[in-house]
Curated annotation (Swiss-Prot):
The gene is Edil3. EGF2 and EGF3 form a rigid rod via an interdomain calcium ion binding site, while the long linker between EGF1 and EGF2 lends considerable flexibility to EGF1. The lineage of its organism: Eukaryota, Metazoa, Chordata, Craniata, Vertebrata. Disulfide bonds join 26-37, 31-48, 50-59, 78-89, 83-105, 107-116, 123-134, 128-143, 145-154, 158-314, 301-305, 319-476. It is found in: Secreted. A motif (Cell attachment site) lies at residues 96-98. Residues 24-60, 74-117, 119-155 form the EGF-like domain. Glycans are attached at residues 73, 88, 140. This is EGF-like repeat and discoidin I-like domain-containing protein 3. Its main location: secreted. Residues 1-23 form the signal peptide. Residues 158-314, 319-476 form the F5/8 type C domain. One of its GO terms (cellular component) is extracellular region. Promotes adhesion of endothelial cells through interaction with the alpha-v/beta-3 integrin receptor. Inhibits formation of vascular-like structures. May be involved in regulation of vascular morphogenesis of remodeling in embryonic development. InterPro entries: EGF-like_Ca-bd_dom (IPR001881), EGF-like_CS (IPR013032), EGF-like_dom (IPR000742), EGF-type_Asp/Asn_hydroxyl_site (IPR000152), EGF_Ca-bd_CS (IPR018097), FA58C (IPR000421), Galactose-bd-like_sf (IPR008979), Neuropilin_MCO_CoagFactor (IPR050633).
Amino acid sequence: MKHLVAAWLLVGLSLGVPQFGKGDICNPNPCENGGICLSGLADDSFSCECPEGFAGPNCSSVVEVASDEEKPTSAGPCIPNPCHNGGTCEISEAYRGDTFIGYVCKCPRGFNGIHCQHNINECEAEPCRNGGICTDLVANYSCECPGEFMGRNCQYKCSGPLGIEGGIISNQQITASSTHRALFGLQKWYPYYARLNKKGLINAWTAAENDRWPWIQINLQRKMRVTGVITQGAKRIGSPEYIKSYKIAYSNDGKTWAMYKVKGTNEEMVFRGNVDNNTPYANSFTPPIKAQYVRLYPQICRRHCTLRMELLGCELSGCSEPLGMKSGHIQDYQITASSVFRTLNMDMFTWEPRKARLDKQGKVNAWTSGHNDQSQWLQVDLLVPTKVTGIITQGAKDFGHVQFVGSYKLAYSNDGEHWMVHQDEKQRKDKVFQGNFDNDTHRKNVIDPPIYARFIRILPWSWYGRITLRSELLGCAEEE
């Protein structure tokens, strides 16, 4: 038997098996019947590799060996289970190359080693994207994402405009502690003028001069993930005015408020504001805010507290970023339509489908159908099946004539031939989405449940003037 153990030691070293413990744990050897002691395991001080015919924690149990014609008995190298961390022991007649007994351990996700004794460090594979910080856990990992990203691997971007500038957020959703009145009350700098890049003589919100604790508030109408804010000043009577610094508060009911604080402290965060009246300045929230109401409290102002702004973020579920109509990521050839209108029947005034991009500028800046009927459609080919969670629509003007789609349906397909119309789950019929009421304001609709498809069609159902459309699709390219 001594010669057999010595031979095992020699062969084991040449094959690269785990080294035997040299400390007090394995010296003297606690394994009986020629068992080999292994130390350095995750959840036990040592483990015994038992020779054929023996089993148990110390190789003290005799195994009943079956003949070639018989099926193995219930006793064997897998009783008791030598595998750690929930590993499954399987009897193996094949020579495995790293041990001398007839079994292998099938390890659960997150563990490896001969006996599943090692916790895998998943962070070594760098699963967290977009600057996320990985923390290794037992058989798992977690990603701490920057404010503008979310998802298990920080794979979803969450920094789109929430609609102050575009008009998705209505006037009624923007309120303030006070309003400045000038020129004997003829000029009123209302809170709903606080829209980023707003033009005109009165183009921002200004707090009243006697307002000692001014604030402006946005009601998002539902709980959303807010990851940042863009601020901008304005000129009033030729004089630059802007907010140099501010604080942020948030609430879910509009009554109980919490101040945004420096991460890991009880100190209220003071955000840097603007340095002139026109240049936008952005701040991100890490961690992000999850709330329905957001308030901005000016701290230091130049002359008067004057503001234009936009909130950034996404729906709580994420996956609500623009898919590329406005940015051009969706290319011209991917956008097609049922028909096209030409003003004065001139090619230079052709309202092609490729022009149906949100906020497109120019004299011919949208898609207009050649016919005004409910058989018209605008189609976007996303090239691969994509999760679509929302849509933004906008009208346009044709030589001063206001035109827009007042309502529409959505259809989707994966092959471009067989189509399904998105259904209203409660009423069990085709969903009719509310469209626009003018030529310029953005109108956003959430698609719930989301559509998962390659092709999307907008089916105009009612319209003003001619069927005219600019649009953006919202969603994400993957679902992990």
